[in-house]
């Protein structure tokens, strides 16, 4: 139970939210490195997964505002959970496109963002897709990029679960 009390205290500290933000910056930087340096074309699913990761970053920024305020902290945790869950669902679907190809199950040809937030028009260098979702263009330790994203987003949800449980324990 000491672990949960420590996690509760840690979640009320700006450093915890800053670490989450740095995690997102690292992975977004890696995505841009793959795209612009290694010249790997991002697909539609890659862009949606990138947006989900940015959602985790937005949650981290929100939590940074006032981590001692329970409302702000819980809203940050909820946004983190929603973004990580959406990222996991997208990554699992992307893995399915890669390893169970079907002419009936394909990703869109173009990214579709709402009219009020056309990210691919505002920042095409980051949000424009021109790759094929079913192609495996990169692997590390025999896992494709979407498989790594499944691990990353699932890891986020596991970490989030521990932190949410810790909210019900008294701080040290």
From Swiss-Prot:
Q: Cite the InterPro entries for this sequence.
A: DiS_bond_form_DsbB/BdbC (IPR003752), Disulphide_bond_form_DsbB (IPR022920), DsbB (IPR050183), DsbB-like_sf (IPR023380)
One term under GO cellular component: plasma membrane
Cytoplasmic side residue ranges read 1-16, 68-74, 167-172
Please provide the record's keywords in A-Z order. Cell inner membrane, Cell membrane, Chaperone, Disulfide bond, Electron transport, Membrane, Oxidoreductase, Redox-active center, Transmembrane, Transmembrane helix, Transport
Q: Which SUPFAM superfamilies match?
A: DsbB-like
> Which GO molecular function annotation, any one, does this entry have?
protein-disulfide reductase activity
Where primarily located?
membrane
Q: Where in the cell is it found?
A: Cell inner membrane
GO BP annotation list: protein folding
Record field: transmembrane: 17-33, 52-67, 75-92, 148-166
* Positions on the Periplasmic side per record topology: 34-51, 93-147
Q: Does the keyword Transport apply?
A: yes
- One Pfam family it belongs to: DsbB
Q: Which family does it belong to?
A: Belongs to the DsbB family.
Q: What does this protein do?
A: Required for disulfide bond formation in some periplasmic proteins. Acts by oxidizing the DsbA protein.
Q: Indicate what this protein is called per its UniProt record.
A: Disulfide bond formation protein B
Q: Which organism is it from?
A: Vibrio vulnificus (strain CMCP6)
Q: What is the lineage of its organism?
A: Bacteria, Pseudomonadati, Pseudomonadota, Gammaproteobacteria, Vibrionales
């Amino acid at each position: 139970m000491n672990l949960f009390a420590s996690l509760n205290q840690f979640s009320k500290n700006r450093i915890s939210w800053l670490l989450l933000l740095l995690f997102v910056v690292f992975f977004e930087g890696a995505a841009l490195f793959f795209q612009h340096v290694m010249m790997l074309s991002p697909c539609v699913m890659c862009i949606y997964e990138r947006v989900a990761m940015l959602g985790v970053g937005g949650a981290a920024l929100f939590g940074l505002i006032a981590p001692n305020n329970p409302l702000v902290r819980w809203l940050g945790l909820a946004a983190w959970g929603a973004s990580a869950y959406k990222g996991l669902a997208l990554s699992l679907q992307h893995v399915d496109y890669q390893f169970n190809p079907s002419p009936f199950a394909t990703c869109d040809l173009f990214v579709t963002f709402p009219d009020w937030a056309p990210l691919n028009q505002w920042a095409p260098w980051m949000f424009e897709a021109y790759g094929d979702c079913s192609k495996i263009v990169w692997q590390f330790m025999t896992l494709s990029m979407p498989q790594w994203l499944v691990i990353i987003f699932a890891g986020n949800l596991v970490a989030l679960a521990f932190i949410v449980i810790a909210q019900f324990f008294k701080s040290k």
